[in-house]
């Protein structure tokens, strides 16, 4: 009887949460957005038509701002504060690692307006998070950012760096994207000074303060870690867990970048310096 009561209480709690505009409970178990392979096909259709961008740096050393998990929900104060930091020391590019919005009624334009200086004074590259797929929001993401799986290069006077963006918003790359990733790395990685992969879902999790946060299937994790090491990836940047972490595995530096979300007592981001060597520092507002 007690067991039935606990189950009933839990079920009632889940139903209550499911009615919340910021929590897509069904979407946590089966996606209401397109599958990862379908999303990848749509991204490739855009890439095939529009090509892959290049960012020009006037110097061989340059900075990259990395931020994530703002969960836009009406108030952009932390995003505004971060943008002011950027404006005080602009960089040629910035990376956003996912979870642009937090609910089905979120205003995507708020994020775009707040980050406009990053895209006007440099280039802003975005990857989707799980919250950007909940409530069937993939078409919204696509209408604003056009692609979720792509690569670009930074061209310096004496070097070139490769960046690869992966769509891991549903906790997997899928077969097609995984195949594409290896094709890109095999064909290009050896021609670049540094290779950086950025995506939403983390590969390692040490800090337990956020409770459980989903990641890849263990076999997929092993496969991707091997792939990154095999082709000499230098840096893997992820978000999702909201905490700052750094793990070195197989010669690759894996970072989880802290969340910029308003609710966080210590909202943060990362500042990466690319040159002969790579340095990354966690910063807090």
Q: Over which residues does each language-model region extend?
A:
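N-terminal active-site segment of His-dependent metallophosphoesterases
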Residues: 21-109
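Extended active-site neighborhood of metal-dependent phosphoesterases/phosphodiesterases
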Residues: 33-48, 106-194, 214-230, 235, ...
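Hydrophobic beta-strand anchors of alpha/beta hydrolase catalytic cores
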Residues: 64, 94, 163, 195-196
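Active-site glycine-centered loops adjacent to acidic/histidine catalytic or metal-binding residues
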Residues: 69, 98-99, 129-130, 200, ...
């Amino acid at each position: 009887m007690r067991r039935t009561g606990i189950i009933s209480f839990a079920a009632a709690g889940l139903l209550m949460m499911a009615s919340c505009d910021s929590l897509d409970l069904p979407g946590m178990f089966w996606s209401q957005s397109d599958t990862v392979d379908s999303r990848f096909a749509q991204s490739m259709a855009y890439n095939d038509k529009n090509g892959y961008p290049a960012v020009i740096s006037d110097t061989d050393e340059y900075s990259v701002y990395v931020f994530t998990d703002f969960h836009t929900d009406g108030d952009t104060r932390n995003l505004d504060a971060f943008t002011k930091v950027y404006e005080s020391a602009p960089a040629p590019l910035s990376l956003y690692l996912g979870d642009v919005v937090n609910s089905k009624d979120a205003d995507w334009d708020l994020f775009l307006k707040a980050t406009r200086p990053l895209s006007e004074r440099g280039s802003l590259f975005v990857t989707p998070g799980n919250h950007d797929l909940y409530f069937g929001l993939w078409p919204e993401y696509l209408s604003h950012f056009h692609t979720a799986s792509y690569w670009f290069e930074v061209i310096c006077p004496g070097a070139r760096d490769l960046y690869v963006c992966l769509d891991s918003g549903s906790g997997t790359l899928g077969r097609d994207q995984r195949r594409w990733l290896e094709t890109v790395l095999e064909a290009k990685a050896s021609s670049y000074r540094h290779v950086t992969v950025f995506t939403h879902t983390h590969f390692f999790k040490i800090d337990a303060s956020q409770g459980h946060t989903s990641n890849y299937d263990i076999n997929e994790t092993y496969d991707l870690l091997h792939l990154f090491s095999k082709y000499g990836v230098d840096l893997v940047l992820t978000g999702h867990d909201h905490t700052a972490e750094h793990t070195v595995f197989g010669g690759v530096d894996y970072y989880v970048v802290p969340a910029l979300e308003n609710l966080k007592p210590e909202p943060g981001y990362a500042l990466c310096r690319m040159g002969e060597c790579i340095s990354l520092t966690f910063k807090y507002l």
